[in-house]
Regions:
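Flexible, small-/acidic-enriched active-site or ligand-binding loops
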Residues: 170-172, 223-253
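Short Gly/Pro-enriched turn/cap motifs at secondary-structure boundaries
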Residues: 163-166, 190-193, 207-209, 234-241
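Conserved hydrophobic/aromatic beta-strand scaffold that supports enzyme active sites
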Residues: 156, 170-174, 181, 199-203, ...
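Alpha-helical interface subdomain recognition
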Residues: 3-124, 136-141, 148, 152, ...
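A short core secondary-structure module
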Residues: 181, 185-227
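A short, Trp-centered hydrophobic/proline-enriched beta-strand micro-motif
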Residues: 151-160
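Long, acidic (Asp/Glu-rich), low-complexity accessory segments flanking structured domains
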Residues: 249-267
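Flexible, glycine-rich active-site loops centered on histidine and acidic residues
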Residues: 130-136, 157
Length: 416
């Protein structure tokens, strides 16, 4: 009897697994027959090639000086706007490129191969800030802000606080209604792009008693009284500004509420899935950049009469890293395509970010080792890649949060 019950349960489990796989890999009406994840449209290929050229000619000469000064060169930000890289998915009517999400992911990856700091500036602006406006903001806010964000105004995403990191909705920043305005009071921490930003997306609670249902998203201009305070001195991505942002009775028009009052938590949850794919792309680009920097050296340097890259122990190492980078890239591209097809992608986004950040650590660490003492110096970008990679396991959801997200979705899939 028990054997029969177990067999029946096993058949049910197998059938459920088959349905899950079919749902995940079924042909989408948007794409026709399935093809390689490397299959890019003409526009996507052009975007990738253009960004590759921009990164090499405009960004690369300034990477080391920006890292040493811990400051983004203003000419780089202007260059990103001039190249059309700050409104990649923004509709043409608002001055954007009206390109695909994959185009944005390709741009983030290619920038990260040269400098992850520039990459994350572009990433946060596109995948978080612009997407919030495109998806949730009123037509009036879109008309006012999207053209600026596509052409000359940098944005930032103000969610984290000193006591609200992984527990993102334990917010203390308050928004009090006063006539046709809200008055914001509180302090945000770890805000990327904040030193240079003109537009701040701020998450605050209108009523702490409501818990997460009181959280609301506001559009706040720097000119409204935002104070960008302490700038963090960081291990890596030093040219990317990370600051404390203070709101001391900052008055914001009620019309600057994004979406509905009390729906900010929904915006944050949904938008961070896209942001995680962006961070995965950044980590893939970083890993590839470190790999590309170290590999030629293995076939130039000789020890014991042989090229270092010809020793079998070394061959196994760089072959494994190449596999890891390829797998991380495919996870990232798959998550991007699922998002474009309007299919569930939260699990795949978490997987991509988790794995890509792990691969970036392994690849950059190995690359430093492969180049020996030279890799440990500041004359090459390898030690910078090694420092830059660590943030991938921390921001936009720590690795433990990604694992928790994946496990939660898997448990639901196998219990439903």
């Amino acid at each position: 009897m028990m054997r029969s019950v177990l067999a029946s349960a096993a058949r049910t489990t197998c059938a459920r697994s088959t349905r899950l796989l079919r749902a995940q890999f079924s042909t989408s009406k948007h794409t026709g027959a399935p093809g390689s994840l490397y299959s890019l449209s003409e526009e996507e290929a052009m975007m990738r090639d253009m960004v590759t050229q921009f990164a090499r000619t405009t960004v690369q000469p300034k990477v080391l000086s920006m890292d040493e000064q811990e400051k983004m060169d203003p000419s780089i930000i202007r260059g990103l706007f001039d190249a059309g890289l700050m409104g990649i998915e923004t509709p043409a009517d608002f001055g954007g490129a009206e390109a695909s999400f994959t185009s944005a992911i390709l741009a983030i990856e290619e920038l990260a191969r040269i400098d992850p700091s520039v990459s994350v500036l572009c990433d946060v602006h596109n995948t978080l800030v612009n997407t919030v406006f495109r998806t949730y903001a009123s037509r009036e806010l879109q008309e006012e802000y999207l053209p600026k964000l596509a052409t000359n105004k940098l944005g930032c995403f103000c969610l984290s606080e000193a006591g609200a990191g992984s527990d993102a909705f334990a917010l203390q920043t308050r928004a009090r209604r006063d006539g046709d305005e809200y008055v914001l009071d509180g302090t945000k921490m770890w805000i990327t792009n904040s030193a240079e930003a003109d537009v701040f997306l701020v998450f605050a609670t209108v009523d702490p008693a409501l818990g997460y249902r009181g959280i609301t998203c506001f559009v706040v201009d720097r000119s409204m009284g935002v104070k960008v305070a302490k700038k963090e001195r960081k291990l890596g991505i030093r040219a990317s500004s990370t600051c404390q942002v203070e709101f001391d009775s900052v008055r914001v028009p009620a019309s600057n509420v994004v979406g509905e009052v009390g729906r900010g938590y929904k915006i944050a949850i949904e938008i961070l899935n896209e942001g995680r794919v962006g961070i995965a792309a950044q980590m893939v680009g970083l890993a590839q950049g470190a790999f590309d920097c170290a590999m030629p050296y293995l076939f130039q340097r000789k020890q014991f009469g042989s090229r270092v890259g010809d020793f079998q122990a070394m061959q196994h190492q760089y072959a494994q890293i190449a596999v890891d980078i390829e797998a991380a890239r495919l996870l990232t591209y798959n998550a991007a395509r699922l998002k474009e097809e309007q299919r569930p992608f939260a699990k795949q986004a978490a997987m991509a970010k988790l794995y890509a950040s792990q691969v970036a650590e392994r690849a950059s660490s190995r690359a430093v080792e492969w180049m020996g003492g030279l890799g440990f110096t500041r004359e090459l970008p390898l030690e910078k890649f090694y420092r830059d990679c660590k943030i991938g396991a921390i921001y936009e959801g720590t690795s433990n949060i990604q694992l928790q997200t994946i496990a939660k979705i898997l448990a639901k899939e196998y219990q439903d």
